[in-house]
A protein has these predicted regions:
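An aromatic/glycine/proline-enriched structural segment found at the starts
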Residues: 135-140, 173-238, 340, 395-430
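M16 family metallopeptidases and their MPP-like homologs
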Residues: 5-40, 44-94, 107, 111-115, ...
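Peptidyl-prolyl cis-trans isomerase
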Residues: 95-99, 103, 154-156
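Conserved, carboxylate-rich catalytic/transport cores that coordinate ions
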Residues: 163
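PPIase-associated folding chaperone regions across multiple families
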Residues: 242-251, 255, 268, 401
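Short Gly/Pro-enriched turn/cap motifs at secondary-structure boundaries
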Residues: 1, 219-222, 282
Length: 430
């Protein structure tokens, strides 16, 4: 309970209904996303504009959004209007209208987004990089070009079936933060007791392809004045709060997470060939990638890759300096100190506690790790999780400008289409 402000935040996590659930019906990719957005549209008793007006009248907010493994329902209300807000939540959750016109509009929007992702170098880089990481069978490696084919096959009956199967309290969680006693809140939520449970199947995921050696991949984007670069690999680290994943993030802070990181200082401040270069670990319950990302002046593509590999090599082999370690400790501690100020941030904190079954003092444990992690441990993490000989290097840019620079780097070089398949004929290039 938080009494500083007269407001209440709620977050439902409907587990199993995230975009990974599309792996169960690969010919209907996009179904989870379309369903989630339709839940933000009309209900049986309110049109979409009428519902928006009703919520605005009382200063409330209800939104459905989707993540990897769950659909999230986020609710915000002034304390004095919580009863009416929950009535509207009940309407949205249990009485979606699923109007044909709204379904057609939302499906069309997703098709347009998928098409747009094939036109920008940065978007192409993201989708081809995922294909390299996860392969061509796993849903996480499926490009938007496939969505452009599957979205038109989704019907309104598919949406209704998905809603019936996946929008369930089975294994779901609810977190509440705000100016209300727990018992009073539970009484107001008793309408959830009648919610019928259904057991949805687990996502079907596939083993990632092995990376035998560092390889350079190229996808052509005609006329691109900037080159999009992605460099990295799929780690074996699931997300954690106080173990190896957290510590690997501290290790990476100096290399590519801070504004004054080695990568950003080199490519932006020293070479002046980019607006920014970043690197990060990005896992969930499932192990995720370590990625260096940047966009550079096309003429400096080869230079950028040499400098990135040089910085990674130096960090993995020589490690962090005393000054860098001290700065990391100070900067991360200050950043985290401001991470739980608002009720919305506290909502996220509680959701994290639940999702990862974490100790309530995990932030204290994190602070202890930040303050005590040694140079030796940082350097060991750099050696272990910056595998110089097993990286995917992806470049998206104009072939005429970029290809000669790539060929001079000495890595195995493979050209791909914008959906990540090897080019065997020049006609495959856009």
């Amino acid at each position: 309970r938080q009494t500083e402000l007269p407001e209440i935040w709620l977050s439902f996590a409907l587990k199993g209904s995230g975009y990974l659930s599309d792996s169960l019906t690969m010919d209907k990719l996009g179904l989870a996303s379309v369903t989630s957005q339709l839940m933000n549209a009309s209900t049986l008793n309110f049109s979409e504009p009428a519902m928006a007006a009703e919520l605005e009248k009382i200063g409330s907010f209800i939104s459905f959004s989707m993540a990897e493994d769950a659909t999230f329902v986020t609710v915000h209300s002034l304390s004095k209007h919580i009863d009416r807000t929950l009535e509207l939540l009940q309407e949205k959750l249990f009485s979606p209208a699923f109007k044909a016109s709204e379904f057609a509009r939302i499906r069309k929007q997703y098709i347009e987004v998928a098409e747009a992702q094939t036109r920008e170098a940065d978007s192409i880089a993201n989708m081809v990089y995922d294909r390299l990481l996860y392969g061509n069978k796993d849903i996480r490696g499926i490009p938007p070009t496939v969505l452009m084919q599957t979205l038109p096959q989704i019907t309104l009956d598919d949406v209704k079936g998905y809603y019936k199967t996946f929008y369930s309290p089975q294994d779901s969680t609810l977190v509440v933060v705000g100016d209300i006693e727990q018992e009073a809140m539970l009484e107001k939520l008793d309408f959830l007791l009648d919610w019928q449970q259904t057991a949805a199947a687990k996502p079907m995921l596939h083993a990632a392809p092995e990376v035998e050696q560092t390889t350079l991949y190229f996808a052509h984007k005609a006329g691109a004045t900037q080159t999009a670069i992605r460099l990295g690999y799929l780690t074996d680290l699931p997300y954690d709060l106080t173990s190896t994943y957290f510590k690997a993030g501290l290790m990476n802070f100096t290399l590519g997470r801070a504004f004054n990181s080695r990568l950003n200082l080199n490519l932006r401040e020293d070479k002046g060939i980019t607006y920014g270069a970043r690197s990060r670990f990005d896992s969930s319950d499932l192990p995720g990638p370590y990625t260096v990302s940047t966009a550079v002046t096309a003429a400096a593509t080869g230079t950028a890759i040499r400098e990135i590999m040089g910085e990674i090599t130096a960090y993995a082999e020589q490690g962090i300096t005393d000054a860098e370690l001290a700065f990391m400790r100070s900067a991360v501690a200050q950043r985290d100190a401001l991470a739980y100020e608002t009720n919305q941030q506290k909502l996220g904190f509680l959701a994290t506690l639940e999702k990862y079954q974490a100790d309530k003092d995990y932030t204290v444990q994190q602070q202890h790790i930040i303050n005590t992690i040694s140079k030796a441990e940082i350097n060991g993490l750099a050696r272990n999780y910056l595998p110089l000989d097993q990286l995917n290097i992806l470049v998206v840019g104009d072939r005429a400008t970029v290809w000669p620079q790539l060929a001079a780097l000495g890595y195995p070089l493979i050209e791909l289409t914008v959906d990540g398949t090897p080019v065997t004929d020049a006609k495959q290039r856009p």
